[in-house]
C-alpha cells in the first residue's frame, strides 16, 4: 500500500511541479497508469496458480522494486519526460498491482476458513491505513522541497521495501497453488 499510494496520490504533483504539465491535462497521464494497473492482474493472474504463488509474488514485488529504483534514478538525472515517466509507471504498476492483489489473497489462505475474511480485512486495513496515510504525506513533503534528490530518496525507500517484501514472500510464502484451501489451513472446526 505504501508503494501504490506513494506514487498514485502524488503523481499529479510530479507531473505539474517537475514536468510543467497543466493540471487540466493530468488525467491523460493517469489513464495509462490505470491501464497498467488493470492489465497486470488480468494478464499475470493465472500465472500465480500455474507457476506458483510464492515465486510469482516474489517476482512481481522484486521486479516492481527494481523498476521503481531505475525509474527514480532516471527521474533524478532528468533523463525522462512526462511521457516516458508515465510509461515507466505503467510498466511498474503492471507488476506491482498484480503483486499487491495476490499478496492479500495469499495472506488470507494461511488462515482457517472461519477467520479468512477477517484476515483479509485486517491486513487490507492495516496496509491501506499505513500506506494510505504515511506515503502520500511523506511524498507530498518530498515533492514540496522541489528537489529531485528528495523525491528519488522516497522512490528508493519504496523500491527497497518492495524488494524486501519480495524476498520475504520467497522465503516464507505459502505454496498454495492448485491445493484445496483446507489443506493449507485446517478449519477451526476440523476433527482428526
Predicted regions: what is each one?
Residues 1-41, 132-136:
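Extracytoplasmic gate region of multi-pass secondary transporters
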Residues 15-16, 47-48, 138-147:
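Interfacial helix-cap and linker-helix signal at transmembrane-aqueous boundaries
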Residues 41-52:
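Helix-to-loop junctions at the C-terminal end of transmembrane segments
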Residues 50-62:
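Cytoplasmic membrane-interface "Motif A"-like loop-to-helix N-cap segments
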Residues 63-79:
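C-terminal ends and interior cores of transmembrane alpha-helices
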Residues 106, 159-191:
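Multi-pass alpha-helical transporter architecture, strongest
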Residues 141-160:
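A membrane-interface helix-boundary motif in multi-pass transporters
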